[in-house]
Amino acid sequence: MAWPDSVMNKKSGLSLPDDRTITISVIAGSSNGLTHQLTKARTSIGRTGGSADIKIDDEQVSPLHCVVGVTYDMVRLCDLDSANGTYANEERVQAAELEHLSEFRLGSTWLVVTIVPRHFKDSTWF
């Protein structure tokens, strides 16, 4: 599936919704336990030492591996032509839509996205 340039373009008009908190957490791999609450609509993920917003300690992850773009009603994952690929639902993808508790893999690192309404103080509602 082709992905709009707007996901990678920093001036795309993407915006975080004010009624939800979106978090990406490492659930398996050497960076296990790392949690990052998204504070902007375009967030890059890559290997430690690179210029990515979220840095993963995994040699199989490219310095700029993928980007997560957020609109009001959608969270999008887009591979940035990484060497080892981005995987969602056990398939290598160029792009994928993520929902609450969607898991994806970069190298040997597994991550999960959580989308929680802001009026909940924690994620125990699910």
Per-region residue spans from a language model:
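Intrinsically disordered, low-complexity acidic Ser/Thr-rich regulatory segments
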Residues: 1-59, 69, 118-126
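Forkhead-associated
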Residues: 34-110
